[in-house]
């Protein structure tokens, strides 16, 4: 099945999926986080009540539902409450399942999940006061390194626990005034059950897809490339960081032009005026062959990140 998150490029109609009436129990254990305090609770903690949350404003609305800024009446803490659309489907189920699993300071935390008698589902999450990276443009190399390190820490955590995001882009990376950056939106993510379970299906946002995801049958795409299930996330990450650096999407925002550029052209590169370390970093993220792209773990040890300390 084909699913594209950004309909400005493709307008595809999917067969309707019958929504279940209740959330199924989580089939996977909560994953312990590295570098996280032992006091951090699991997602379904039952420590919150919807009645105890005051809605302050609407933060955004999309295919997955509406997100509100809310305040806990007891603690005065601010959170984001995602109200899933009534006709929630496998995309919503997938996001809920993954949110129940993950526990990392580099991934937007799920504090609780609520379901009312009518079946309406809401997810209480971290509130990131500066919104997404979508509005952030023209940063310094030092700022880019700080953001890149946090996103890669999150990617490394997810990949180590066999979760492929498949929709890394500026809109799905959230930031706070504390200089925190966290990965969000797991609607099209996938849990890799077997090490060779291919996740290069055509899902995510078209403009940020890697060559092997745009066309897995193209000349030069090997079985090794297809089985490298995590490399597509690295391409999307590299393109996202390059966009934030230069201040605009680095390719023509047209479907045919993107396919030609990504699948048949040279990979995007950092501007000439950038440092050699940054040029190398981008090259390691945006190699055409998936098998040649660096992993999140390798990129965390790249000189571009190490030399910014």
Curated annotation (Swiss-Prot):
InterPro entries: Kinase-like_dom_sf, Prot_kinase_dom, Protein_kinase_ATP_BS, Ser_Thr_kinase. Phosphorylation at Ser-195 and Ser-201 by MAP kinase kinase kinases positively regulates kinase activity. ATP binds at residues 59-67, 82. One of its GO terms (molecular function) is protein serine kinase activity. Its EC number is 2.7.12.2. GO terms for cellular component: cytoplasm. The modification Phosphoserine is found at residues 195, 201. The keyword Kinase applies. The active site is at 167 (proton acceptor). The keyword ATP-binding applies. It comes from the Eukaryota. The modification Phosphothreonine is found at residue 205. It catalyses: L-seryl-[protein] + ATP = O-phospho-L-seryl-[protein] + ADP + H(+); L-threonyl-[protein] + ATP = O-phospho-L-threonyl-[protein] + ADP + H(+); L-tyrosyl-[protein] + ATP = O-phospho-L-tyrosyl-[protein] + ADP + H(+). Keywords: ATP-binding, Kinase, Nucleotide-binding, Phosphoprotein, Serine/threonine-protein kinase, Transferase. Belongs to the protein kinase superfamily. STE Ser/Thr protein kinase family. MAP kinase kinase subfamily. This is Mitogen-activated protein kinase kinase 8. It comes from Arabidopsis thaliana. The lineage of its organism: Eukaryota, Viridiplantae, Streptophyta, Embryophyta, Tracheophyta. The gene is MKK8.
